[in-house]
């Protein structure tokens, strides 16, 4: 045997015997046996039997595929209120995954508490929402008082990004129980009573939904009494656009995916993380079967083989509602259903981006993909994927049964359709307001919110959540819809409207959302990762370095991979365009206002 063909484990640096081949040392038989024994062992930290048994007890007979990694991490995190290293090592062994893969996923998501084996998991965690709406309602003062009031070493109080309950601001979440209009006393009472789970919500159940005509459209499609092409045409004619923020025409998306090769998949996005947005949660808590029917109609028309529903982890109560509704549907439906899997997010805002959500469903870090290819062609598990926001599917049944003209017949100021506005901030009656597309902010507040809160005058507003920009009261008569706000440096997105008054400053709102973006950047691309953090630092100065901030805004907008980094500069640009008096060092300069106390001129 020539030296060049000799197995590497036979070539040693020293040995008791030598061959006749100059420069080559051959191992002894005992050394070869020891080398073979070592090569059969795993390298790195090994799982201990006790931890393996604890992990097995939690995941049971559930699949060990990579795409359920996050589900298994949730089970461990819930049971032990944290992820100790020993459990992560054991899970890696059980799932036959590299430990690095398990650790990098566990450390990516905010809701996973990765602990050293010597660390003690917190007995109870209270999360105080520091989103803009809660900040306006006194979240900072709540955060300051709670640690002293609670006085428990085993109770941890931390700040958390928007929890999707802005109409109830301020909000604190005691383990999984959201405390609305939270005061220190209400939170302390929930802690002392160990009231840590969400209260059950009353919703339209399967029988009540069927009694008023629910699931009839799905049954007619399966029976051939309704035609898929007619349904698709109705969707196209209605003008319904994606209501998660992107605004892509829903019917066109159905047709694109329908033309792709099989198998085709569907991913439903209920990771409602845009600060100020709570419409999906509100509808899901009240009428889950209307959404499920729209989902099944889309699946039938497009030819979907499996559906994955990605639900925001903050929505613990919704998870119970949706689990029950799916169980009712699967046991009562008289027609075949595609496979439906409910997946749980883990506190990463970036997973609201469609490709990041797909990465998360596949059990990976939620990092956006480069495009093309688009997920309609290469999506979940490499298959053509129909991705939809919850509310988009919620309206499918009404549009098809009432006709495309029913939906498109609504609208104001030349716009068509309906929009669900999540309104919070300085108004008397915050909440989800179903209103005609194209309604102005002034009309929305006067007609649907009972006017401005007492003692408050309209000063500014965010028309599209954290990323949609900030507009002054002088632009309160601009129609609110897709494509109407871009000329003013803003967009409507998910229609999360946060109203500011003369008691607030736009620069403070911009800083709040920029800090949010800095915390939520996935870190994949430098312009977003570094730019958001640097911008948040610069925005704290009494006088802004406008040139540097505009340079940062340009780089982030041009070079970021996904919408987070591209839209993060919007609040900066808006403050510099409409509220320069707040950041240029002029003392006590009031902006020009065109409204007296209240909203109506």
What residues fall within each predicted segment?
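Ferredoxin-type iron-sulfur electron-transfer modules in oxidoreductases and energy-metabolism complexes
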Residues: 9, 21, 35-126, 130-163, ...
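Short loop-to-beta-strand transition segments
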Residues: 450-465
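N-terminal glycine-rich phosphate/pyrophosphate-binding loops that anchor nucleotide-derived ligands
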Residues: 230-264
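Short amphipathic, charge-patterned alpha-helical segments
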Residues: 294-296, 437-453
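Gly-rich Lys/Arg/Thr-decorated short loops/hinges at beta-loop-alpha junctions or inter-strand turns
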Residues: 210-216, 268-280, 375-380, 422-427
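Hydrophobic alpha-helical positions that pack around
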Residues: 319-437, 449
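Histidine-anchored nucleotide/phosphate-binding helix
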Residues: 109, 287-301
């Amino acid at each position: 045997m020539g030296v060049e063909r000799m197995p590497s484990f036979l070539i040693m640096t020293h040995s008791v015997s030598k061959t006749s081949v100059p420069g080559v040392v051959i191992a002894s038989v005992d050394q070869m046996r020891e080398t073979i024994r070592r090569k059969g062992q795993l390298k790195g930290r090994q799982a201990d039997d006790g931890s393996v048994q604890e992990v097995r007890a939690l995941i049971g007979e559930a699949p060990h595929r990579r795409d359920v990694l996050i589900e298994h991490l949730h089970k461990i995190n819930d049971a032990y209120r944290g992820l100790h290293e020993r459990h992560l090592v054991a899970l890696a062994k059980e799932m036959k995954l590299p430990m690095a893969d398990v650790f990098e996923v566990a450390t990516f998501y905010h809701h996973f508490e990765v602990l050293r084996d010597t660390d003690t998991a917190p007995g109870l965690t209270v999360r105080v929402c520091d989103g803009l709406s809660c900040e306006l309602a006194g979240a900072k003062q709540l955060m300051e008082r709670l640690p002293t009031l609670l006085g428990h070493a085993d109770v941890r109080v931390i700040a958390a990004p928007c929890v999707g309950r802005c109409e109830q601001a301020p909000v604190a979440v005691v383990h999984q129980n959201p405390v609305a209009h939270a005061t220190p006393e209400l939170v302390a009472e929930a802690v002392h009573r160990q009231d840590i789970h969400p209260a059950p919500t009353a919703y339209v159940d399967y029988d009540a939904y069927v009694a008023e005509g629910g699931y009839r459209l799905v049954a007619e499609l399966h029976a051939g009494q309704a035609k898929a092409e007619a349904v698709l045409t109705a969707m196209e004619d209605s003008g319904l656009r994606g209501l998660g923020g992107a605004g892509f025409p829903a019917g066109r998306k159905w047709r694109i995916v329908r033309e792709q090769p099989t198998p085709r998949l569907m991913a439903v996005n209920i990771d409602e993380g845009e600060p100020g947005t709570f419409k999906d949660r509100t509808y899901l808590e009240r009428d889950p079967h209307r959404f499920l029917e729209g989902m099944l109609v889309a699946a039938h028309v497009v030819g979907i083989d499996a559906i994955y529903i990605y639900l925001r982890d903050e929505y613990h109560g919704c998870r119970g509602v949706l689990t029950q509704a799916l169980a009712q549907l699967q046991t009562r439906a008289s027609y075949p259903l595609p496979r439906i899997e409910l997946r749980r997010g883990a506190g990463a805002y970036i997973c609201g981006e469609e490709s990041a959500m797909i990465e998360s469903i596949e059990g990976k870090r939620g990092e956006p993909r480069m495009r093309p290819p688009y997920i309609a062609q290469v999506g979940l598990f490499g298959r053509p994927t129909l991705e939809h926001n919850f509310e988009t599917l919620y309206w499918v049944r009404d549009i098809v049964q009432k006709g495309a003209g029913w939906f498109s017949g609504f609208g104001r100021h030349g716009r068509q359709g309906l929009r669900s506005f999540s309104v919070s901030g300085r108004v008397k009656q915050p909440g989800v307001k179903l209103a005609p597309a194209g309604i102005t902010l002034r009309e929305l507040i006067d007609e649907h919110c009972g006017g401005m809160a007492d003692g408050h005058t309209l000063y500014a507003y965010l028309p599209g959540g954290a990323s949609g920009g900030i507009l002054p009261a002088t632009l309160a008569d601009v129609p609110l819809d897709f494509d109407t706000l871009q000329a003013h440096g803003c967009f409507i997105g998910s229609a999360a409207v946060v109203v500011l008054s003369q008691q607030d400053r736009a620069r403070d709102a911009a800083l709040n959302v920029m800090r949010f973006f800095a915390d939520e950047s996935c870190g994949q691309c430098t312009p977003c990762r570094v730019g958001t953090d640097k911008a948040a630092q610069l925005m704290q100065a009494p006088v802004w370095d406008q040139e540097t901030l505009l340079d940062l805004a340009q780089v982030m907008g041009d070079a970021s991979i996904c919408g987070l980094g591209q839209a993060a500069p919007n609040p900066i640009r808006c403050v510099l365009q409409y509220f320069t008096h707040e950041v240029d060092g002029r003392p006590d300069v009031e902006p020009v206002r065109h409204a007296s106390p209240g909203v109506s001129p």
